[in-house]
Regions:
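N-terminal hydrophobic/helix-forming segments and targeting peptides
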Residues: 1-172
Length: 172
């Protein structure tokens, strides 16, 4: 833990995690006569779409969209007309405990479709996408089409649907 005493030695390599979402790692130089340091950072969470809680939107009893929110600056067009899936963390009740399970649905599950040109004549004229209207993914579950989104997650994790308490899921 960050708050515990660390025995730092020349040439040592160390890491710590925060909230099971971040890792901070560093290596100590072998010569400590120069007390300078370099910092390198990166993140892999942006841009993306975060799946909202109670995400299913049934449209005219014909198809299902997932309610998402855009995260980070993105080029919307790069998300269109390609197979997408979901990964992240799911909180599950196990007995008297709440456990975090990692989820990666490693198959095509979603798509954010472009609409036909006759339905959007401005598509080639600098069309401005509305993330809450134009960029909601369609659930294209294939063999899972009779299941709701939460059941797909439960099946993937091998848990009961009613034991899922929450999630932190993202499209990729």
């Amino acid at each position: 833990l960050e708050s515990e005493h660390w025995d730092i030695v020349p040439g040592g390599k160390y890491y710590v995690t925060r909230n099971n979402t971040s890792i901070l790692a560093f290596k100590v130089g072998t010569k400590l006569d120069n007390y300078s340091f370099n910092i390198v950072t990166s993140h892999t969470d942006s841009p993306t779409f975060k799946v909202k809680e109670n995400a299913e939107i049934e449209v005219k009893n014909k198809y299902t969209q997932l309610n998402t929110e855009g995260y980070g600056g993105m080029l919307c067009a790069t998300w269109l007309d390609r197979p997408l899936s979901i990964a992240g963390r799911v909180l599950v009740s196990e007995g008297n405990s709440i456990v975090t399970k990692l989820l990666n649905i490693d198959r095509d599950l979603l798509m954010i479709p472009n609409v036909a040109i006759h339905m959007n004549r401005a598509a080639n004229d600098g069309f401005k996408y509305n993330l809450q209207v134009d960029m909601l993914p369609l659930l294209s579950a294939g063999d899972d089409r009779q299941k709701d989104f939460k059941q797909i997650i439960a099946d993937e994790l091998g848990v009961k649907k009613e034991d899922i308490l929450g999630h932190d899921l993202y499209l990729y």
